[in-house]
Amino acid sequence: MKKYMIKITLALAAVFALAACGGSREPGDAAGARVLRNLFQRSGVPANIVSFKKTQGREAHIGTQDVYEYWYESEIQFPDGYEAKCAEEKERGPCALLGIAEDQTFQKNEILKSEGSLHFSKTGKGWAAEDKNDY
């Protein structure tokens, strides 16, 4: 009887462990930094991410879509300087990614401490990000 109980306990533990691993995990620091880096490259922003940290996140359901809102803090370095033209920005672009609202000039190697947000949509492969990749 004792061996039977041990087998059942082990089987239940395995089922619970597999169930816990089955769901797609929320995006973490590495995914967020990669998305931000890809968006900078796509927007032509010559920047390096010095540090990146997720500060908050939450799942939501909008219409028929499961989404994940992701807030972060980062330090961004501009190796060759950068001229941010925020007044001309009509859509979510470089200035939104940098967390700034007004035109700003960054000197060579200047570091900007910024806060921002990223958005993900749940797919069969995980979480699709704004850079069109799954994480």
Regions found by a protein language model. Give the residues of each.
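Sec-dependent bacterial lipoprotein signal peptides
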Residues: 1-19
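Cystatin/cathelin-like cysteine-protease inhibitor module
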Residues: 21-135
